[in-house]
Amino acid sequence: MYALGVLLVCLLGSYLFLFRLEHVRVLQEREKARYVVDSYATKIQYVVANAFSSAYLVEALLRQGEGRISEFYSYAEELVKMHPSTININLAPRGVVTKVYPFERNKKAIGHDLFANPERSREALLARDSGKATIAGPFDLIQGGYAMAVRLPVFMGEPEGDITAQEKFWGLICVTFAFPDVLDPVKLEYLDKHNYVYQLSRIHPDTGDRIVLLRSAETLVEPVERKVHLPNADWIQIGRAHV
């Protein structure tokens, strides 16, 4: 009887020891997952900001030309070469598209009023009213495929250069990118290769629902979560190592 009691105590001690080891291992894996999620969230922010720099370069040219870009198509061509995921670049004075590159496959966009389109107006209005670049999408393209866009509002003073004049809304610079191609430099596929399950989501601006943009094949269980702060939008990157 005494021997049985000793055996039970030893078994219980072994179980508690193993349980403790497993608990520590899970905590370590979770901490590692938190580091990985933070790293990739930062990468996504950087890659998106780098892609969106095209819009700011167009803005600089627009200001230099006091609201006009005489060589728009030449400059736009070079910007597309810099960011191969770019689908098109638009100039929209007062929200109405007047120039688009590449022209031939996007010429139907000429005359399109971004403020009048119920499916696209929300982000355009938010960009104008906030005075900040705003992400639209990702959304389905009419010609097929999936894309996201940046709407950059431009405000300018009087052409005479009166520094006391209040800047007025000129319009929007819109750059559209193929999605998820725009995120290729992030190398999300490395997460799968290194035994991580991940999911990238966004909050729908109208419904508040969480919409999954990209994910691993496996389902996440007790994931680590991190917001990805983007222009006038937040995405959510969540992930977890296999444990």
Q: What are these model-predicted stretches?
A:
Residues V6-G67:
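Juxtamembrane extracytoplasmic/periplasmic/luminal helical "stalk" adjacent to the first N-terminal
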Residues R30, R34, D38, R63-I236:
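Intrinsically disordered, low-complexity polar/acidic regions
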